[in-house]
Each structure stands twice: as structure tokens, then as C-alpha cells.
Amino acid sequence: MSLNLNDKKAVVAEISAKVATAQTIVVAEYRGIQVGHLTQLRAKARDQGVYLRVLKNTLARRAVEGTAFADLASEMTGPLIYSISDDAVAAAKVISDFAKTNDKLVVKAGNYAGKTLDKAAVTALANIPSREVLLAQVLGMMLVPVASFTRGLAALAAKKAEGETPAAAAEPVAEVTEAAAE
């Protein structure tokens, strides 16, 4: 079905709005993919907050014109599905994960931070943990010293409660008394 000029302008405006806030765009060829599989891909993309759409390449080129994603225009040939995301890795992750299980979906290229990515770079980007996972890992690393310190204080308090003086604390006192005697 062909779109009239007003419909084309509306599509370009919609995609331009998505691209304006996006961090990543990934394009993949979907030649021969079954409708049921494409529906599953769309559901996964929706769950991850990724905008996924099959577009006419000319309309997509016009939407990215003048943006950081303009370099991707040279890769926009053939039947493509466009994956656009505000999250840096979500678009690459959705497309790459689906391409692992469905050989008819072939990652073609991507663009992140104004740089065009080839298939290998998109796959590498997809293997990076999501923002939430990275934040959880950083928080975990920040809490390790605090947890170790509190365990040490708890052990010290337990020894004092038993009436024992910790060996480490007793040695410096002995050294001070020897130094005072000389």
C-alpha cells in the first residue's frame, strides 16, 4: 500500500521525534521471516522499551537527516526493520538476541553515539549489560567495603563482650610500654 504525501510527512515526523531522543539505532534485514516471529520480536521490543518498525528506506533517511544518525543512511538498503532506543544497549540487545534464534533476521548495521557500527560492533554492544544491571554492580562494589567494615566492628564488639582484648590491640600497647622504659 502506497502512502500519500501527508502520510509520508507524518511518518517522517514520528520517526524524527523518536530519533531526536534516541541513543541507538539498529537496522536488520528481515527477508523471509514469518509474521508470527515478527510479532514475537515486536512484543520483546515493546517489553524493553524499544521502538521497532518496518519503514521505507527513503522515509528513514529523511528522518535521520541532520542528526547524529545521518551516517547510517548509507546502510539503508533492502528490506529493513528499524530498532530505535533511548537506552544505549536495548535496541542492539533485542535485535541480536532474536537473530540468534532466527537466522532469517540478519543484523546489518547500527549507530551509537554518532558512530556507525557494523554487525560485529552491534553484537558487542548487545553483550554489554543494561544500565540497571551496571548500576546494581557498581552499588554492590560500593557496599562491599562498608559491609566488611561493619563485620569487623561486629567481631571486635563480640570479642570485647567476651572480655578478651583483641591480639592486634594488645601488641601496640606492649610496644609503647617498652619504648617508655628505655
From Swiss-Prot:
It holds the Pfam family Ribosomal_L10. InterPro entries: Ribosomal_uL10 (IPR001790), Ribosomal_uL10-like_sf (IPR043141), Ribosomal_uL10_bac (IPR022973), Ribosomal_uL10_bac_type (IPR047865), Ribosomal_uL10_CS_bac (IPR002363). It comes from the Bacteria. The keyword Ribonucleoprotein applies. The keyword RNA-binding applies. CDD domains: Ribosomal_L10. One of its GO terms (cellular component) is large ribosomal subunit. One of its GO terms (molecular function) is structural constituent of ribosome. Keywords: Ribonucleoprotein, Ribosomal protein, RNA-binding, rRNA-binding. GO terms for biological process: translation. HAMAP family: Ribosomal_uL10. Forms part of the ribosomal stalk, playing a central role in the interaction of the ribosome with GTP-bound translation factors. Part of the ribosomal stalk of the 50S ribosomal subunit. The N-terminus interacts with L11 and the large rRNA to form the base of the stalk. The C-terminus forms an elongated spine to which L12 dimers bind in a sequential fashion forming a multimeric L10(L12)X complex. Belongs to the universal ribosomal protein uL10 family. This is Large ribosomal subunit protein uL10. The lineage of its organism: Bacteria, Pseudomonadati, Pseudomonadota, Betaproteobacteria, Burkholderiales.
